[in-house]
Amino acid sequence: MKYAWIEANRDSYSVTMMCEILSVSRSGLHDARGREPSLRTVDNTQIVKRIQRAQLKHRGRYGRRRMTPEVSEILGRPINHKRIGRLMRENDLSSRKRRRFRVVTTDSKHAHPVAPNVLERDFAARAPNQKWLADLTYVPTDEGWLYVALVLDLFARKIVGWAMSQTMPQELTLAALRVALGWRDPDPGLVHHSDRGSQYAANDYRDVLKARGITVSMSRKGDCWDNAPMESANGTVKVECVNDEHFKTRAEAERVIVEYIGYYNTERRHSALGYVSPAEFERRWRAAMNQAMKATSL
């Protein structure tokens, strides 16, 4: 009975401490484990199987935080995050690690006017198409760098615009913006925030924003924290889509990134959204809005 209690609470308390309090030896605990599988052991086996399936589905991208709601949802009951973490470590099911590349993508030495920081690190949005972030990132290939321009909707952390090129011309960021505008068709009043790079400060880019009634906001010089959620999204793309890949061509990299963006938007659980995907977060918001409208019409 004592051994079973220790096994049931090993994620919450130190095994050594529990053995001392209950006056049992660790060797006795090990012997008890070697007899017949306890209910806890059987349950752990089932949890590990679910973790393995989830890591296959998400290609090894999930760590303990995202794996916990994933497995809990599959099993239909809450599983302690410490238990998930321990089982992942013991079974070599940990997620991918971050690795950094160094390439300069912000050209702030230009003659274009720089907009003030209207956003002021207020990353909260009450609805879609209120606040967008934009930035450039890059992917190594055997042919050279592939530059990627992204546009992120802050409300659901959804990637709503993207474009790719072997160089960083103004047309690259403008193409990503046009994808976002075509897909989302935002009303006037949206705030568009980016760094102070020439691609975003250029007249053509700002003219498109002005024509749609979009307010321009730019980070302070050299302060990446002013665009932190966008920097985080770029880092996620690097870790989960690039780090463990070897792209021979830019075309290959572009295909994989486009596929990943679809996964990021529709399947990947996001920590800022209560660990649901951007698409699910927006779906729940729309359902709540529809329910509220029905209630007010009664």
Explain the meaning of each model-derived region.
Residues 1-298:
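Charged DNA-binding/catalytic regions of mobile-element recombinases
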